[in-house]
Amino acid sequence: MKILVTGAFNCINEQLKAIESLGNQVIFMQNESDVLPCDYTWIEGVICNGLFLYHDIKKFTNLKFIQLTSAGFDRVPMDEVERLGIKIFNARGVYSIPMAEFALTGVLSLYKGFKFFCENQAQKSWVKNRNLIELFNQTVCVVGAGNVGTECAKRFKAMGCKVIGVDLYPRVDEDFEIIYPLDKLDFALSNADVVVLTLPLTEQTRGLFNKHRFAVMKDGGVFVNISRGAVVDEVALSSALSSGKLYGACLDVFDKEPLGSDSPLWDYQNVIITPHNSFVGNNNNERLFKLILENLKGI
């Protein structure tokens, strides 16, 4: 197969050679927005992230295989992929561990006042905080019980939490006390001290967390979003923070990125903002490479 690999896969020469050793021809392109280094019709497979934001998928007339370096499919014209019968794979499980660790760290940072202490350290100020909270025995609702959600559940369970889930496809899973269907979301939220979003962005989930969802959450809850920014109505979130409805929030993703300097979310003392960074981990490349080889061998 003739494969275009983009810089979205931060590969080394040995990895490209391993892909070629499976009988493939490989051509590399660093920036996905650049002019292609070959004719569209030459390409039978691509390893990419946002390539089709810049290049019309209809021009790839011989395309049979897409390997995404992202967990989400929202940067790909899935209607065309399905119509053309192209096999597509996401980076399933590649980023689950660092994202789950990030979610746990965010909640602990809020409960243990790390932002307060770090700011005092910068001022060389020795001030105690008597209002810290234990994570032990809290109920955590993970919305989206896929690979990332399951890794989150494992870690919160290990901290002594009761973990419940919400998913389009509920199932019995040892890492969750129960996984509710999506139509039970409000009930699950009303029983949770911590809510962690790990669900994908689809037309069904876009704007899912609106004014109503924040209203049904328990008073004093913690909200974590490591999924996609467009799942959340940021005006409703800001209102829930300013009213004191939420104890705090850890936000790694936003509707528009970078987050604008005029966003009120920057100004809350009880909000941790990170620049879509939760997926980063030192073992990602190794996991992604292994997954790519498995998928190539399987087609």
Specify the residue positions occupied by each region the protein language model found.
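C-terminal helix-to-coil terminal segments
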Residues: 87-102, 116, 256-299
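Residues at the starts of beta-strands that form the adenosine-phosphate
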Residues: 2, 25, 139, 161-162
